[in-house]
Amino acid sequence: MPLSLGPDPRTERLRRMHAALLTRYGRIERPSEKRRKPEWVLVHGVIGAQTKTAASNASTDALLHEFGDWNAVAAMPVAELEARLRRQTFPNVAATRLKACLETIIEQRGSVDLRHLSNLPTQDAMAWLETLPGVGRKISAGVMNASTFARRTMVIDGHHRRIMQRARVVPPRADTARAYDALMPIVPGEWSAADIDEHHLLLKKLGQTYCRPRAPICESCPIRGDCATGTAAAA
C-alpha cells in the first residue's frame, strides 16, 4: 500500500504569506468588470518588457484607440509601431515582437481573436500561446488569469520569482517556467483565479518595497518568518 505523504507544507506557507501581505498592504483586487479582453492582455505582455505597468497600460490603450482593432495594428510597419511605443523601455523590440506575434495569430486563426482558447484546457491554451513570438510563461499565464478568461494560473514576474527563490519555495536557479511548475501544484485549492491574481499583485508589491533585488529589507519584511533568507538574516 503506497505511503501517503500528506499535504505539501509549502501550501500552508503560501497561505501564511498571503495573510501577512494582506495585513501589511490591504486588498489589491482586480474587479471583474475591469478585466480586459485576452487580446489586450496579450499585447500588454508582449510590449511590456522592463516597463512600468502604467506605461504599458497607456501604450496598449493608445494602440487600440487609434487603430480600432488588433488586425489593423498588425498591418502597421514596425517603424510606425515603434514610434507609437515610445513609452516602452525598448520600443524597437516591443514593436518587432508585437508585429510578429499578431501576424502569427492572423496566419493561424484568420484574425487576432483568442476566443478559441476558452474551449481548451488551461494547460493546452497556455502551450498554444507559448508558440507565439515573444510569449513565454509569464505572458501565457497572464492572458489566462488576468483577462476575462479568469483561469487559475499564476503570473510570475521577476519580483515574484525572486521572493519565492529567497524563501526557498522554488529552486534557487528556477526560470519562470520552472518556478510556475513548482508553484502551481502547491497553490491552495480554495484559491480562485482572483485570489491567485491578488497573491501575485501582493508579492509584486513586496518585491518593490522590501524584497528588492539589492539590499532587501529583511528585518521588517512581513513574510520574514516564512522566508529562509529572512530567517537567516535575523539569526
Segments predicted by a language model, with ranges:
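Catalytic cores of DNA base-excision repair glycosylases
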Residues: 2-235
